Amino acid sequence: MARKRKGRDISGWLVVDKPAGMTSTAVVNKVRWALGANKAGHAGTLDPEATGVLAIALGEATKTVPYITDALKAYVFTVRLGQATNTDDAEGEVIASSDLRPTDEQIKDALAPFLGDIMQVPPKFSAVKIDGQRAYKLARDGEDVELAARPLWVEELLMLDRPDPDHVLLEMTCGKGGYVRSIARDLGAALGCYGHVRELRRIWSGPFEAEDGITLEQVEALAKTPELDSYLRPLEEGLADLPELKCSPEGAQRLRNGNPGMVYPGEAEYGDEAWASFEGRAVAVGIYKSGELHPARVFARPE
């Protein structure tokens, strides 16, 4: 018999403005402890030294994590020109350098090939698996890691500032699976001067923005208090990119039992993925067909 998780049965999202110097998993564990939650997970890893939006799902909201993971995200980051590191960020060892410094116009021109559908090779120090092992573990052991290129959608890549010849501030909006460190590395290569990420901040992810996030200091200060609960965002915010279809009491009951349930007409078309709601609360996510939602995920929450 499976052991029952200890903790409160709460569902929703807590948007944390992650500090530098912590892993995403450590932040999730801190939030789970502070809220006394029985289940928690994040919607997209940030490197330990990165800051910004870390959206943490609690309880039944963990079923909506894939929709945030798949959503567009935006990053502001500083590229250090003239140096390559083995980790493609400032934490690594400098492995190559150049005295060449591109002009602002050369940098802007070099950004264009990174837009749209591109193929990107992840950093060697990343969580990508190779034959069942994390690439960063192999790289730490001195193995020559070869990673395959992966597709990435880059919606926007802008130059925001050039504070000095060695640094350039960029903003990127991209889809799932993007590595900002790879952008810095490949931009440096395209400019012929090398490059790595100096600082990185995720400013928004799907519907969640860093400026609306709670700090980890606040989480710790409000731990185990009702005040911390007030920062919880509804589970439904994780479904913001899907059409909502309202359902009747009978339809809601059928959906809760895992069966197709009748929904009222809305913006979804036949075959679309959508979510059904009853009295403003999400009941299920599934495929819309002929006036019914065929559930793939059902949200089991108290009435």
UniProtKB/Swiss-Prot annotation:
SUPFAM superfamilies, sorted: Pseudouridine synthase
GO molecular function: RNA binding; tRNA pseudouridine(55) synthase activity
UniProt-listed GO biological process terms: mRNA pseudouridine synthesis; tRNA pseudouridine synthesis
Reaction catalysed by this enzyme: uridine(55) in tRNA = pseudouridine(55) in tRNA
Ion transport recorded as keyword: no
E.C. no: 5.4.99.25
Highest taxon listed in the record's lineage: Bacteria
Enzyme class name: isomerase
Active site: 47
Keyword set, alphabetical order: Isomerase, tRNA processing
Family statement drawn from the similarity comment of this UniProt entry: Belongs to the pseudouridine synthase TruB family. Type 1 subfamily.
Protein name, per record: tRNA pseudouridine synthase B
Gene: truB
